[in-house]
Regions:
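Small beta-barrel nucleic-acid-binding modules, primarily SNase/OB-fold domains
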Residues: 2-199
Length: 199
């Protein structure tokens, strides 16, 4: 026959002293404050350090604003260096006198080039609208500006009325009657004077 050891009666706990109560309260408050600070830190990180889409690269969403302006994935606008494309609402005339939407066509061609991917731009200066003026490239298109001029979707554009960097490409497009050269058109600079921006 086995006998069990008798349980010793528990000694009554002594009541906490004021100092012990204050210490426990301080520990609880310290933990609460730490949790609140962590939450505040998380909110601040989310607000001020949230993910920004890349300006360029494989995951960037690069779009055309018109025939010579690109909006990068981070929202920065780039005007393509050395060219002047028909304005978005500008029309041109075919050789037979028929009107066509050359401004929309220039934007569509730029969009097609951008869809090739691997777009990058190297800023050279800023224009009066605070856009960066940049030489841009895309997959298989080392110089987007030159490509647009060579295909007749933009004009060579230099300072003042001087020749820009793509005069040879423009001469080629004009001789082959590509794009706007297949009929008649107002130079984009003249069209802007005749149709001022409302902003």
């Amino acid at each position: 026959m086995t006998t069990r050891a008798k349980r010793q009666p528990r000694e009554p706990q002594e009541p906490l002293t004021d100092a012990q109560m204050k210490r426990q309260l301080a520990q609880v408050l310290g933990k609460v404050i730490a949790v609140v600070l962590v939450i505040i830190l998380i909110v601040l990180i989310e607000r001020y350090c949230s993910y920004q889409p890349p300006a360029f690269g494989p995951s960037a969403h690069v779009t055309s604003m018109d025939g010579d302006t690109i909006r990068a994935g981070d929202g920065t606008e780039y005007r393509i260096y050395g060219i002047d494309a028909p304005e978005l609402h500008q029309t041109c005339l075919e050789a037979n006198g028929k009107t066509w939407l050359c401004g929309r066509a220039a934007k569509a061609r730029l969009t097609t080039i951008l869809k090739r991917g691997n777009v990058s731009c190297e800023a050279r200066a800023n224009d009066k609208f605070r856009r960066a003026i940049a030489v841009c490239s895309a997959e298989g298109v080392p110089d987007i500006g030159e490509a647009l001029v060579r295909e007749g979707y933009a004009l060579d554009f230099g300072p003042g009325n001087s020749a820009g960097p793509y005069r040879d490409a423009q001469d080629e497009a004009e001789a082959a009657k590509r794009g706007i050269w297949r009929g008649t058109f107002d130079r984009p600079s003249q069209w802007r004077l005749d149709n001022p921006r409302l902003d």
